[in-house]
């Protein structure tokens, strides 16, 4: 499985923010249902929107463990164990931060088999070259070693003109 099988490429290239979150939530719901797995979110730039969106799906409590909204760097470090070195070297808007967010989420959420991290920059005061730049990581707990995870990260450029 790859992240592209969960998040279609066309969505990553052209999606507006609400469409991206809605589609991501539907894909994650379908995956959790088919795998009979539970999942959790670690959200930064989405500020809990993924949790709120997935919470609208009837019966989702069977699969959804919860979400950690970690908007600030220090909160990412304290709640998800994202290293200060990663945040200083690569910033919060990086594949490295997304990877560590997923690992920290799965480490701290024992009943989740799947972790999804969303981090990025969505303005409103973002410079044009980074506005809409988002990294989404999806991690899967290794069945043979519950302290080991497989993580895929996708860089996404969202259509910033229609976030709401």
How should these model regions be labeled?
Residues 2-164:
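Short alpha-helical segments enriched in small residues
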């Amino acid at each position: 499985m790859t992240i592209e099988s969960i998040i279609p490429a066309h969505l990553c290239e052209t999606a507006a923010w609400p469409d991206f979150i809605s589609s991501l939530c539907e894909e994650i719901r379908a995956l959790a249902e088919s795998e009979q797995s539970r999942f959790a979110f670690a959200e930064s730039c989405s500020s809990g929107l993924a949790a709120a969106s997935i919470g609208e799906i009837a019966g989702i409590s069977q699969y959804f463990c919860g979400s950690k909204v970690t908007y600030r760097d220090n909160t990412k470090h304290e709640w998800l164990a994202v290293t200060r070195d990663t945040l200083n070297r690569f910033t919060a808007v990086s594949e490295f931060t997304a990877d560590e967010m997923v690992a920290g989420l799965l480490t701290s959420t024992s009943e989740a088999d799947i972790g999804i991290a969303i981090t990025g920059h969505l303005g409103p005061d973002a410079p044009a070259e980074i506005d809409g730049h988002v990294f989404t990581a999806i991690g899967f707990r290794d069945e043979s070693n519950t302290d080991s995870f497989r993580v895929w990260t996708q860089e996404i450029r969202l259509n910033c003109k229609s976030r709401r």
